[in-house]
């Protein structure tokens, strides 16, 4: 599953053990294999969209109190918070689209008093020039509200949405 670890130290240890065993270890980031995500990646890479102006990525989900009754959920030792447990798939998608992050600023907190953040907002600037926001929360009332990625470019705007980014709008 994902992510490989919650800290850089743990990641180095995992890497060391994998190398020693002569094995391969791959996290599961299935958005890269989503046909619509792959299509957007192709449009970006081909230059068809022109210069990327901005993106917005929203992961607005619900994880009710029952979810947090499971002993490791919401703990700093095992969970890592909304960026690790829910939004890491979308962080990976942003890396897939735009490459390495150049700079970032963010705010977050635990609105319900957990050891980890349950809501986060970040501004990300990528070396490729793409700039945008990532908003993630598990504090939406009653049920998941939206998973949405909007890309504003010189020659088009794209929105991926739906439960599994299975809807696309292009204009």
Regions found by a protein language model. Give the residues of each.
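Beta-strand-loop-alpha-helix segment that lines the small-molecule cofactor/substrate pocket
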Residues: 1-32, 47
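Predominantly a Rossmann-like dinucleotide-binding segment in NAD(P)-dependent oxidoreductases
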Residues: 31-113
């Amino acid at each position: 599953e994902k992510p490989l670890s919650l800290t850089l130290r743990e990641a180095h240890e995992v890497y060391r053990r994998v190398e020693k065993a002569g094995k391969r270890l791959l996290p599961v980031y299935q958005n890269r294999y989503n046909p619509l995500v792959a299509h957007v990646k192709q449009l970006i890479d081909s230059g068809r969209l022109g210069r990327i102006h901005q993106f917005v990525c929203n992961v607005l989900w619900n994880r009710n109190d029952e979810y947090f009754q499971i002993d490791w959920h919401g703990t700093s030792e095992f969970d890592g918070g909304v960026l690790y447990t829910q939004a890491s798939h979308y962080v990976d998608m942003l890396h897939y689209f735009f490459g390495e992050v150049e700079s970032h600023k963010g705010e977050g907190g635990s609105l319900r008093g957990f050891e980890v953040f349950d809501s986060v907002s970040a501004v990300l600037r990528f070396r490729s020039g793409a700039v945008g926001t990532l908003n993630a929360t598990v504090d939406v009332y009653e049920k998941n509200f939206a998973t949405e990625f909007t890309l504003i470019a010189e020659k088009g705007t794209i929105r991926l949405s739906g439960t599994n980014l299975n809807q696309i709008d292009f204009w």
